């Protein structure tokens, strides 16, 4: 499989090279809108009908019972439990460190302003199932929700045709203290959390990855006054490597990204043409040892190897592209990292593969894709809170800023605003 190599492209060519795979269509929008409407109107009945239609699953009880949870946890090997436990510990440590103290400041005499982080009461987590049940995502979403103090955490995940949820997903959920787990997947699960059904409660904010139907459902959920973590598209990695980089490391980073899905995109940026020319062969050699080769090949088909003149150009390209994952596999990694302003998560040095962040380093793997890192952050503790501001003014405090408020209100022709100050100051 040959990855396209582009040498020294002019800046006018960059937008073409930066294009992501986009699958937004009117048909997709309409299909999801129909699912949303069906769930809104028919509730649990719609969830059962849609599970049978799309997944061939005959659903019984939608909720995972305590007995099912225990049975699933008993099935998880001790080795995997230990791995999940270590990952959970690191993720919890990093997210606990993000706690912010309440802010209080006197802006002028007698005027006190405060800001307090308040947890979102009820959040919904979507965990994909299918061929790659993402139990790691349970940790990435469930642990911050618990640390933030969300009192109600609802989780939806599809079950298999045997009616069972993946055992590792349930073990990870128990690790996070999640007990409200429902057997529902796809766009209909998002609809259930956005609208509420007889069994699944409506939530205030929805988190989690998924296919294009899930992503479209999350976008449409916002019409129902439900917040989402972020817009999302296919996963992506950008690798910056110098002439000293081990090609096996670079190739394995390409391949680990490519196995996320056929629309995933991997990009190498380098100023070393010789490295760029050798990389495709190493990719092919490692690919031959892996499963899912056909899907990986599709992903590599719209991936890029790009040779640029200077590191300044490399950084400009990185910041213009705004990658979900950025690997700096080069001697200048720390210096370059300080110049990165648009990226979801950055991995410094040869021993920092994306896989570490995907699972166990402690950072969150729910990150902005498709260029949204220009403005969005990855999921963090703040994602599960809202910031409420408070102000307390004494009479003297109001007197101190009263003339300013009255003058500004009058200039905006909002005379009732002016009056609200004047009556308090006996004017």
Model regions and ranges:
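N-terminal Rossmann-like NAD(P)+-binding subdomain of aldehyde/semialdehyde dehydrogenases
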Residues: 1-121
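Short acidic-hydrophobic, aromatic-tinged amphipathic segments that line or gate anion-handling sites
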Residues: 2-9, 180-185, 305-310
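Flexible, glycine/charged-enriched surface loops at secondary-structure junctions
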Residues: 100-107, 227, 264-269, 289-299, ...
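Conserved small-residue-rich beta-alpha loop and adjacent elements
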Residues: 105-171
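Conserved NAD(P)+-binding/catalytic subdomain of aldehyde/semialdehyde dehydrogenases
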Residues: 177-265
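A glycine- and small/hydrophobic-rich beta-loop-beta segment
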Residues: 256, 260, 268-343
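C-terminal core of ALDH-fold dehydrogenases
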Residues: 319-427
């Amino acid at each position: 499989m040959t990855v396209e190599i582009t040498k020294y492209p002019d800046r006018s060519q960059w937008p073409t090279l930066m294009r992501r795979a986009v699958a937004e269509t009117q048909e997709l929008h309409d299909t999801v809108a129909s699912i949303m409407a069906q769930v809104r109107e028919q509730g649990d009945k719609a969830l059962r009908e849609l599970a049978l239609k799309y997944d061939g699953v005959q659903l019984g009880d939608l909720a995972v019972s305590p007995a099912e949870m225990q049975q699933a946890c008993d099935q998880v090997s001790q080795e995997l439990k230990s791995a999940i436990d270590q990952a959970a510990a690191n993720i919890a440590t990093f997210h606990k460190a993000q706690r912010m103290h309440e802010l209080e400041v006197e802006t002028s005499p007698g005027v006190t302003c405060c800001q307090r982080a308040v947890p979102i009461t009820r959040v919904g987590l979507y965990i994909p199932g299918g061929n790659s049940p993402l139990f790691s995502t349970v940790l990435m979403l469930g642990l911050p929700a618990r640390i933030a103090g969300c009192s109600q955490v609802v989780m939806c995940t599809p079950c298999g045709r045997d009616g069972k949820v993946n055992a590792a997903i349930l073990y990870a959920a128990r690790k996070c203290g999640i007990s409200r787990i429902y057997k529902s997947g796809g766009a209909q699960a998002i609809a259930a959390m956005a609208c509420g059904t007889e069994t699944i409660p409506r939530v205030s904010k929805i988190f989690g990855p998924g296919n294009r139907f899930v992503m479209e459902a999350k976008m449409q959920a916002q019409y129902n006054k439900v917040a989402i973590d972020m817009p999302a598209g296919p996963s992506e990695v950008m690798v910056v490597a110098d002439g000293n980089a081990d090609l096996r490391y670079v190739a394995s980073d390409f391949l680990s990204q490519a196995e996320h899905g056929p629309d995933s995109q991997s990009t190498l940026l380098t100023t070393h043409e010789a490295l760029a020319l050798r990389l495709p062969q190493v990719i092919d050699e490692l690919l031959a040892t892996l499963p899912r080769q056909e899907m990986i090949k599709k992903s590599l088909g719209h991936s890029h190897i790009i040779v640029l003149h200077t590191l300044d150009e490399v950084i400009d390209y990185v910041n213009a592209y705004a990658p979900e994952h950025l690997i700096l596999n080069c001697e200048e990694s720390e210096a370059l990292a300080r110049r990165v302003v648009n990226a979801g998560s950055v991995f410094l040095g040869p021993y920092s593969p994306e896989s570490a962040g995907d699972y166990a380093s402690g950072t969150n793997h729910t990150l902005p894709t498709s260029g949204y890192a220009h403005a969005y952050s990855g999921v963090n503790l703040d994602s599960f809170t809202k910031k409420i501001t408070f102000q307390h003014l004494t009479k003297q405090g109001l007197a101190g800023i009263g003339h300013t408020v009255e003058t500004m209100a009058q200039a905006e022709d909002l005379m009732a605003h002016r009056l609200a100050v004047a009556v308090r100051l006996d004017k």
